[in-house]
Amino acid sequence: MIVVPVKEGENIEKALKKFKRKFEKTGVVKELRARQQFDKPSVLNRLKRERAIYVQKLQQVEE
């Protein structure tokens, strides 16, 4: 359960923004979307490998 303490006199939009930020960090929506369809393990492994290669290339460019 996400708890966002609201200080007295604090704007409700600011509190809502804090809530949204905390909610995004939990990854609930991302996991829900991932569970809507089944992906074969071989496809997941391939995507994971491709992402690792992409990240490696980005790190090499930075250096």
Curated annotation (Swiss-Prot):
GO terms for molecular function: structural constituent of ribosome. The keyword Glycoprotein does not apply. HAMAP family: Ribosomal_bS21 (MF_00358). Pfam families: Ribosomal_S21. It comes from the Bacteria. Gene3D superfamilies: Ribosomal protein S8 (1.20.5.1150). Keywords: Ribonucleoprotein, Ribosomal protein. GO terms for cellular component: ribonucleoprotein complex; ribosome. Belongs to the bacterial ribosomal protein bS21 family. This is Small ribosomal subunit protein bS21. Transmembrane segments: none annotated. InterPro entries: Ribosomal_bS21, Ribosomal_bS21_sf. It comes from Phocaeicola vulgatus (strain ATCC 8482 / DSM 1447 / JCM 5826 / CCUG 4940 / NBRC 14291 / NCTC 11154) (Bacteroides vulgatus). GO terms for biological process: translation.
